[in-house]
């Protein structure tokens, strides 16, 4: 998965440098890539911890506890990412200024952070679904979701947006498009799996 992130970095920088000829775009993307880890770190902490709970209850065939853990995880991750979105929407200038004391990319950074952060709540659902796939033995679907959201849809969308609109600001929408594509695939796939694998499980002991 780390290699996917590396390829995404190379691809995005190539779009900014070779197609849009924008050093500000490259710098802004670099700042975002550093800051986003602060938002996503607690999300990954919650989902990684939840994955073992999902796997245990799936293996124990305890439907009620599985569903309870899943709903709680989704709620917590949604809250975390909603807070992240609010911070990026309300304080983008302050965040960017931490990395741009001279104000060279402040305007670009404000626009970028406000657009990109729109995908944070969607990412909460995407990543929760992705770890669910891992927990119940559908790792290929989890990997496919990661590829969709970080590479397969994101880079082509960024390229098309850059070529069509010829602006750095338009490219940031690729994050929203990619996340929406990934969560759509995830919801459709998980709905089928839930019907055939989760719902038939016995109730178990309610906790």
Question: PLM features: residue spans?
Answer:
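Alpha-helical transmembrane segments of multipass membrane proteins
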Residues: 1, 5, 9, 36, ...
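Structural signal for membrane-spanning alpha-helices in multi-pass inner-membrane proteins
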Residues: 2, 13-16, 44, 88, ...
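Hydrophobic alpha-helical transmembrane segments
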Residues: 4, 39-43, 111-124
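Helix-terminus/linker motif at the lipid-water interface of multi-pass membrane proteins
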Residues: 7-32, 38, 56, 94-103, ...
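Small-residue-rich hydrophobic transmembrane alpha-helices
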Residues: 10-13, 28-86, 90, 123-145
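Short alpha-helical transmembrane segments in multi-pass integral membrane proteins
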Residues: 54-119, 161-207
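C-terminal structured "cap/appendage" subdomains that terminate the fold
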Residues: 125, 129-155, 159-166, 171
């Amino acid at each position: 998965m780390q290699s996917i992130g590396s390829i995404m970095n190379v691809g995005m920088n190539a779009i900014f440098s070779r197609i849009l000829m924008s050093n500000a775009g490259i710098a802004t993307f670099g700042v975002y890539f550093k800051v986003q880890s602060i938002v996503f770190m607690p999300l990954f902490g919650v989902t990684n911890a939840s994955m073992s709970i999902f796997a245990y209850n799936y293996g124990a065939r305890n439907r009620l506890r599985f569903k309870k853990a899943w709903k709680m995880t989704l709620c917590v991750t949604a809250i975390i990412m909603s807070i992240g979105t609010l911070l990026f929407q309300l304080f983008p200038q302050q965040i960017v200024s931490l990395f741009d004391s001279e104000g060279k990319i402040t305007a670009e950074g404000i626009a970028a952070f406000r657009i990109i952060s729109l995908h944070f709540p969607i990412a909460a659902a995407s990543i929760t679904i992705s770890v669910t796939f891992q927990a119940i033995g559908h790792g290929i679907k989890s990997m496919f979701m990661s590829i969709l959201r970080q590479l397969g849809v994101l880079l082509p969308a960024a390229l098309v947006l850059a070529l069509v609109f010829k602006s750095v600001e338009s490219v940031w929408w690729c994050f929203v498009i990619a996340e929406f594509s990934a969560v759509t695939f995830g919801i459709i796939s998980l709905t089928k799996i839930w019907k055939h694998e989760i719902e038939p499980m016995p109730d178990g002991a309610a906790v």
